[in-house]
Amino acid sequence: VQIRDLVATPDLDNNYTDGSLTIQADIRNFGKKTAKGYKVCYSLYANKLYSDENEPVILARDTKGAAIRNSVVAQVEPITTGNTQEAEKVVLKVKNPNKWSAETPYRYTLIAELKDHKNRSIETVSTIVGFRKVEIKDTPADQDEFGLAGRYYYVNGKTIKLKGVNRHETNPAVGHAITREMMEKEVMLMKQGNINHVRNSHYTDDPYWYYLCNKYGIYLEDEANIESHEYYYGAASLSHPVEWKNAHVARV
């Protein structure tokens, strides 16, 4: 029995103060018998080196202030052999977390621990999350700092001016065989040049590129490599039929 997938979706409340983290894990059973009594325990930590003094961000306490648990538990329904079952969806509430933005790319570490019916740890995985709310809103002139009405990009309730570049995953010296060191150098050049936005030109990139943009604070515009060029090809383009929407989105 193993964790097949882990999806964590962060959000902020309407005041952009407190955070929530919606978590969904898929559990797969490769055994010969139905797996019963499994659960997933989630803990959220500040993104720093672990030590004995490092407490989870989410920590339930009793009326006297003593810690009673440091994780949220999601139950898993019985999984027949060869199949996958979604664990119970849970939402972690975090009081006034540090927010993620290009200027302050603060991140947290989510730990997911799969346990069996005897409470034995079977597998542990982790992922990085940042609390932020991204919105595109019609803004009247009296609410804009420059007195200009328009459709603006907001991060955590504040308008953001995107200063971006297109990026192809290629290098004149090594072609498409870009190293991680080269990627990190690119991000450093962007930050030094006050660039806060990058568009992956036409296709998804190496997962490490997404990791770096998340780590250093770059607003990343991802694309599905469909090459339909919006409405360039006219009515015959697959950009038009809504039936193809899910297929397009799945490519991102």
What are these regions (language model features)?
Residues K215, A236-V252:
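Active-site neighborhood of glycoside hydrolase catalytic domains
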Residues L220-D222:
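Hydrophobic residues in well-ordered beta-strands that form the structural core
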Residues P207, S228-E230:
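Generic structural signal for helix capping and beta-alpha/helix-loop junctions
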Residues V1-S201, Y210-L212, Y216-G217, V249-R251:
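Secreted/periplasmic carbohydrate-active enzymes, especially glycoside hydrolases
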Residues N225:
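Catalytic metal-binding/acid-base residues of hydrolase active sites
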Residues N54, Y232-A236:
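Short acidic, glycine/proline-rich loop/turn micro-motifs
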